[in-house]
From Swiss-Prot:
Family according to the record: Belongs to the lysine N(6)-hydroxylase/L-ornithine N(5)-oxygenase family.
Gene Ontology MF term list: N,N-dimethylaniline monooxygenase activity; ornithine N5-monooxygenase activity
Oligomeric and partner information: Homotetramer.
Residues involved in NADP(+) binding: 254-257, 279, 323-325
Cofactors named for this entry: FAD
Keyword Oxidoreductase in record: yes
Lineage: Eukaryota, Fungi, Dikarya, Ascomycota, Pezizomycotina
Gene3D superfamilies linked: FAD/NAD(P)-binding domain (3.50.50.60)
Catalyzed reaction equations: L-ornithine + NADPH + O2 = N(5)-hydroxy-L-ornithine + NADP(+) + H2O; L-ornithine + NADH + O2 = N(5)-hydroxy-L-ornithine + NAD(+) + H2O
Protein's name in the database: L-ornithine N(5)-monooxygenase
Binding site residues for FAD: 83-91, 102, 168, 466-468
């Protein structure tokens, strides 16, 4: 019998040198159509982070005849993505040297939806000629830096339909026929972050995927030396420029970002004093055990969505240790080892170069200008029985305070303020259905128009909503929800006459 290796070699050098997906896509025309500003778009996405990028990929794949047996060959969607950043970036401020992903590379932007896609992480490695080298790492967890590069690689394929440096400022309902009672499109206004120029684009369907905004405790004043963890790698080095200087730096928080920053500071500024302040009594390990990890399975969204409000809240609380205020065990052990070595040298913790203050909170910050250190007033928090958890009060003088206290995910509320009157009577919140489509009054909005929310639906769709885990499968659901009729061959109405309305 002929060896399998020999069979693969015969007449098929491309099998080992170039995947079929690359052969198919290398010379293919763009499947998403760049559209002039004054034309009506089929889809406009506000934000071009991982969620919108996954939608672009899913839509591209849905139009690929090699992957989809029944695409409407006569239809090419008019789409646009507006992104405030000047280029694609994913948590650029937290690309800490040595940091790894916390999920398997198989949960990339395409594999779980269709592993034949040319946008898989494995195909990225192949295109970069690193597949065998990555395999030799024997890991499912790539470096965070590499995974961001993978997403940049994907994003480059859609550069023709993305307008970077455009900050969306409002969404306004519109009517093709002014005498009609039904809204049938939305005008999306954006501001160029460099020139301030205002642009307007119209779209039948709008996806709002803004991501999170930095959450800062109200006790903290406005001061450039107080910065969110999302700016750690980009802003702090520009402010504290001398890596040999003996700075005093504090970190606030008890989750993965806080731990990574605290650990990295000790290498980035080896002569500096660092202090980690946390309300919790200790760093707690994240639970990524197999059964618990099933909470991030795509089908669990259906189960979570079907629960009552009270049941959803209980579920979120029960699974909190998978994502909130927790740290990977490997990093906890590294930090504990560092603390132990200090204890060997000096049992007095107050004299340590690097300290952890558990059970504490910052109550007040004194700041007197850029040339004097800030003074942090720290005291012990109280538990449910009104008992002190930490050890009383303490004052710290610091050159910088890194705040790793998470993100708010409510930016869509201000953006959609002009659409509020279209919600069903008596509904005060932005309520998405299972397909992430916002519930709007059908007596006011045409079924052809709609708004979808991404990354802000944890209360209705579960813990995975703002994470990468289900992006691949969810993006397929989104494309089906938004464009299902077009893929089935439904006639798409001619909208070129709307151009004159802008």
């Amino acid at each position: 019998m002929e060896p399998v290796e020999r069979k693969l070699e015969i007449g098929s050098r491309s099998y080992s040198k170039m995947p079929l997906t690359q052969q198919r896509s290398s010379g293919e025309p763009p499947r998403l159509k760049a559209t002039p500003k004054d034309e009506l778009h089929d889809l406009l996405c506000v934000g071009f982070g991982p969620a919108s990028l996954a939608i672009a990929i899913a839509l591209h794949d849905a139009l690929d005849p090699c992957l989809n047996k029944t695409p409407n060959s006569n239809w090419q969607p008019k789409v646009c993505f507006l992104e405030r950043q000047k280029q694609f970036a994913w948590h650029s401020g937290m690309l800490v040297p040595g940091s790894k992903m916390q999920i398997s590379f198989i949960k990339d932007l395409a594999t779980m939806r269709d592993p034949r896609s040319s946008f898989t992480f494995l195909n990225y490695l192949h295109q970069k000629d690193r597949l065998i080298h990555f395999t030799n790492l024997s890991t499912f967890l790539p470096a965070r830096m590499e995974f961001e590069d993978y997403m940049r690689w994907c994003a480059q394929r859609f550069a023709h339909v993305v307008s970077y440096g455009e900050e969306v400022i409002e969404v306004i309902p519109g009517k093709t026929n002014p005498s009609s009672t039904l809204v049938d499109f939305f005008t999306v206004k954006s501001r160029n972050v460099e020139t301030g120029e205002i642009s307007a684009r119209m779209a039948r369907k709008v996806v709002v995927a803004l991501g999170g905004t930095a959450k800062l405790p109200k006790e903290l004043p406005q001061d450039p030396r107080i910065m969110h963890s999302s700016k750690y790698c980009t802003t702090l080095p520009a402010m504290l420029k001398d890596s040999r200087e003996a700075y005093n730096i504090a970190v606030l928080g008890s989750g993965q970002s806080a731990a990574e920053i605290f650990h990295d500071l000790q290498k980035r500024y080896p002569n500096s004093k660092t202090t980690l302040i946390m309300r919790d009594t200790a760093m707690r390990p994240s639970d990524d055990s197999p059964f618990v990890n099933e909470v991030f399975n795509p089908e669990r969204v259906d189960k979570f969505f079907s629960l009552s409000s009270a049941e959803r809240q209980r579920s979120l609380t029960a699974d909190k240790a998978t994502n909130y205020s927790v740290v990977r065990l490997e990093l906890i052990e590294q930090i504990f080892n560092d603390m132990y070595l200090q204890r060997v040298q000096n049992p007095d913790e107050t004299q340590w170069q690097h300290r952890i203050l558990p059970g504490r909170k910052i109550t007040r910050v004194e700041h007197y200008g850029p040339h004097r250190r800030m003074r942090l007033h720290v005291r012990a928090v109280k538990d449910e029985k009104d008992s002190l958890v930490g050890n009383g009060k303490e004052t710290l003088e610091v050159d910088a305070l890194m705040v790793a206290t998470g993100y708010n995910r409510n930016a869509h509320e201000q953006l959609l303020k002009n659409v509020q009157h279209l919600r069903p009577a008596g509904q005060e919140n932005w309520t998405p259905n299972r397909e992430y489509r916002v519930e709007l009054d059908p007596s006011k909005v045409n079924a052809q128009a709609g708004i979808w929310l991404q990354g802000c639906n944890e209360q209705t769709h579960g813990l995975s909503d703002s994470l990468l885990s289900i992006l691949a499968s969810r993006s397929g659901e989104m494309v089906n929800s938004i464009f299902g009729g077009e893929f089935a061959g439904t006639t798409v109405p001619d909208t070129t006459h709307i151009r004159a309305m802008l």
